[in-house]
């Protein structure tokens, strides 16, 4: 937590200064309680962008390959949860569930990887929807639009109203999540 706060105070302002991200829909971010933020994935900088919008610590779900070597300690210090994408990683979901049970925040990119296709979004994997169905945490969709450039069209993140998860199965939650993000990107012309 200390390391995360240190970065928030010193690194995040530098990020904001360089990229001047535009943030829309802040009113859709719950002030307290367990939250799952889920949206499209364009760049390694997406995690930094999402973290700059929130004061509370975000525990990101990230591919386990990032935890090899010296970088592993860095990601662990940030509270990042490693995910083995080659299998259905029950231990990663269990660790995320523990974060949510304590009222924490999970950040996840359900596409599972950077979207380098011409599609608006790649098909979402079911992990975010499963976590939401199981935990009943607020599931807040977001869409990242634009580019991380110092000059020109700036990157933008837009948060949408939380998806209702009570009394719903993971499939219907996942369908609504993917459609919300897709529509947000299509309306913003990505």
Please tell me what each predicted stretch does.
Residues 86-89, 121:
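A conditional alpha-helix N-cap/helix-loop micro-motif detector
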Residues 19, 58, 155-157:
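Small-molecule pocket liners
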Residues 3, 9, 16, 30-87, ...:
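Catalytic core of membrane glycerolipid acyltransferases/transacylases, capturing the structured
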Residues 26, 63-65, 87, 111, ...:
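Proline- and acidic/polar-enriched loop/turn elements at helix boundaries
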């Amino acid at each position: 937590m200390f390391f995360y706060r240190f970065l928030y105070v010193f690194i995040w302002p530098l990020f904001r200064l360089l990229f001047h991200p535009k943030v829309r829909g802040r009113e859709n971010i719950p002030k307290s309680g367990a939250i799952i933020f889920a949206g499209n994935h364009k760049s390694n900088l997406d995690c930094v962008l999402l973290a700059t919008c929130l004061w509370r610590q975000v525990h990101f779900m990230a591919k386990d390959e990032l935890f090899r070597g010296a970088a592993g300690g860095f990601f662990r210090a940030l509270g990042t949860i490693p995910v083995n994408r080659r299998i259905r990683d029950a231990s990663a979901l269990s660790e995320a569930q523990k974060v949510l049970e304590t009222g924490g925040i999970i950040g996840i990119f359900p596409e599972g990887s950077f979207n380098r296709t011409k599609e608006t979004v790649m098909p979402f994997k079911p992990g975010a929807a499963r976590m939401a169905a199981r935990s009943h945490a607020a599931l807040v969709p977001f869409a990242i639009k634009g580019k991380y450039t110092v000059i020109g069209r700036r990157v933008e993140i837009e948060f949408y109203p939380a998806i209702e998860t009570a009394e719903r199965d993971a499939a219907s939650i996942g369908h609504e999540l993917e459609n919300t993000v897709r529509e947000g990107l299509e309306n913003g012309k990505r």
